Swiss-Prot record:
Kelch repeats lie at residues 98-149, 155-205. It comes from the Eukaryota. Residues 1-47 form the F-box domain. This is Putative F-box/kelch-repeat protein At3g16880. It comes from Arabidopsis thaliana (Mouse-ear cress). PANTHER family: BNACNNG10540D PROTEIN, F-BOX PROTEIN CPR30-LIKE. Transmembrane segments: none annotated. Disulfide bonds: none annotated. Keywords: Kelch repeat, Repeat.
Length: 365
């Protein structure tokens, strides 16, 4: 019998790429050869193909101070129920409560009075702790610009300074992972209150919904390091409506609208999205559904299967989190995720082999 260590690389890659994502740390630690193989772009692509073939996609969620990598199986066959599997705690989240994802990297941070943030690649198991220049800085987004076919990752933060009750100044800074350094950003923005909402990254840039002084999207371009013009939504919301954003495999933007006075949820997906331009497709899905309890509107989309997963507090037992899996022609399933006193914090996750450069011991920003 041929030993695994003696197998040719192409066959070994084919076998190991079929392993679930949460097994990758054990695979990388097995030997130096496997660790090198797991970092290859071809290996990552094969694993993504296997994940898609298994009719699953991945999300990262924090429930009751535990970050979990969840596999969501959206099989719509009549004899196979959809499932959501939590693969256990994957990072120490003490004091962390906000999650941002872009291009395979995840930034986890506190909301306010921040002392440290962490950038993390769950696929490679790499992390870097980042110390903000101010304890009152607030992480707004993570994104990247492309330089000579390579991605240069950056983090945008803001610090809100209240001069008086009617006057607020917002200072912005950019952190570059490549240089491990912060620098001041000379930009102006009138959308300070919007930054308390969760942003969504698409193609390396950031998008946030705001109902402050209007009803639209705000973009930040990580290449020009500038805010773009306001971008229209495919609807006009009213006071009390729930509006939420999600990305579709980081290639498209999706928006959810749940009217406060009627039991109907509507979802649209972009045809085109850029920091300076957006084009919305026709209505993607309409569902008759009772109003959501969690006003963040946590949802994910599988565009190919035309299925939406919405996370919310259970309507009858408010201490439990429920995933509602919704599709066309009245398709509706519920998956109980268990007890959670806090609202879940989440982001979708697409694996990437992008490495986080490790700093020399004792070196910090």
């Amino acid at each position: 019998m041929t030993k695994m260590s003696k197998l040719p690389n192409d066959l070994l890659e084919e076998i190991l790429s079929r392993s679930p994502l949460y097994s990758m740390r054990a695979i990388r630690l097995t030997c130096k050869k496997w660790n090198t193989l797991a970092k290859e772009e071809s290996f990552t692509k094969k694993q993504l193909v296997q994940t898609k073939a298994a009719k699953e996609f991945m999300v990262i969620m924090m429930m009751d101070s535990k970050f979990c990598l969840m596999n969501i199986n959206l099989n719509k066959e009549e004899d196979v129920e959809p499932s959501i599997k939590c693969n256990g705690k994957i990072i120490n989240p003490i004091g962390m409560c906000r999650v941002y994802h872009c291009g395979g990297l995840v930034c986890i941070t506190k909301s306010f009075s921040n002392t440290r943030d962490v950038v993390w690649n769950p696929y490679l198991g790499q992390t870097r702790w980042i110390k903000p220049r101010s304890h009152h800085a607030y992480i707004y987004a993570i994104g990247y610009e492309t330089k000579k076919s390579c991605r240069s990752y950056k983090i945008l933060s803001s610090e809100h300074n209240y001069i008086n009750i009617d006057d607020e100044r917002v200072d912005y800074e950019i952190y570059e992972l490549d240089s491990n350094s912060w620098r001041a950003l000379d930009v102006n923005s009138n959308w300070a209150t919007a930054f308390y909402k969760m942003d969504v990254s698409v193609k390396g840039n950031s998008y946030t919904y705001t109902d402050y002084r209007g009803d639209f999207l705000i973009s930040f371009d990580f290449t020009t390091e500038r805010f773009g013009p306001t971008l229209p939504l495919p609807f006009h919301s009213r006071c009390g409506d729930i509006v939420a954003l999600s990305s579709v495999r980081e290639e498209k933007l999706a928006v959810l609208l749940h009217r406060c006075n009627i039991s109907r949820m509507e979802i649209w997906i972009t045809n085109k999205i850029e920091p300076n331009n957006v084009s919305w497709g026709k209505l993607f899905l309409t569902v008759d559904m009772k109003p959501l309890i969690i006003d963040d509107g946590i949802f994910f989309i599988d565009e190919e299967k035309k299925v939406v997963v919405v996370f919310d507090k259970d309507k009858e037992m408010r201490n439990r989190i429920t995933a509602y899996i919704i599709g066309e022609n009245g398709y509706f399933r519920k998956v109980d995720l268990g007890d959670s006193e806090s609202f879940p914090v989440r982001c979708s996750y697409v694996p990437s082999s992008v490495e986080i450069k490790q700093l020399a011991k004792g070196k910090s920003n």
